[in-house]
Amino acid sequence: MTIDEMMSAIKGMTVIELSELVKALEKEFGVSAAVAVAAPTAGGAAAAAAVEEKTEFNVILKDVGANKINVIKAVRELTSLGLKEAKDMVEAAPKAVKENVSKEEADAAKKALEAAGATVEIK
C-alpha cells in the first residue's frame, strides 16, 4: 500500500474510526499521540487566557439512575461502542463518555444521556 493509498483510506474514515485508529496505533507501537505541553513563559497571564478560551470539553457520566438499559443504549449511540463495552462504561460511572469534544457536541451528548435518565457533568 502506498502513502497516497493510505491517505485516501484515512480521508474516507469517520471521526470515530480515526479515533479508533489512533488508539490502535498507540497500543501497537507503545506510543502516545498526546501533544507535549510546553511551560508558559509569560507566567499566569497565559494560563488565564487558556482557561477563558476553553474549546474542548469532557462529558462525564456521574450516575446511571434507574434506567440503566436506556443509558447503555445512549452511550452506544454516542460512542459507537459495542454492547459489552458500553455496559462496562456505564457500570464504571463516574466515567468520561466523550473526551475533548466541542461545546455543541458535549451539550448534545449531555442532553441524550439525561433524556435516558443519567446524571451528566461537562468539564
UniProtKB/Swiss-Prot annotation:
InterPro entries: Ribosomal_bL12, Ribosomal_bL12_C, Ribosomal_bL12_C/ClpS-like, Ribosomal_bL12_oligo, Ribosomal_bL12_oligo_N_sf
One annotated GO molecular function: structural constituent of ribosome
Keywords: Ribonucleoprotein, Ribosomal protein
Gene Ontology BP, a term: translation
One GO CC term, this protein: cytosolic large ribosomal subunit
Superkingdom of the organism of origin: Bacteria
Pfam families: Ribosomal_L12, Ribosomal_L12_N
Subunit structure: Homodimer. Part of the ribosomal stalk of the 50S ribosomal subunit. Forms a multimeric L10(L12)X complex, where L10 forms an elongated spine to which 2 to 4 L12 dimers bind in a sequential fashion. Binds GTP-bound translation factors.
Record HAMAP family: Ribosomal_bL12
Function as written in the Swiss-Prot or TrEMBL entry: Forms part of the ribosomal stalk which helps the ribosome interact with GTP-bound translation factors. Is thus essential for accurate translation.
Protein family: Belongs to the bacterial ribosomal protein bL12 family.
Protein name, entry field: Large ribosomal subunit protein bL12
Gene: rplL
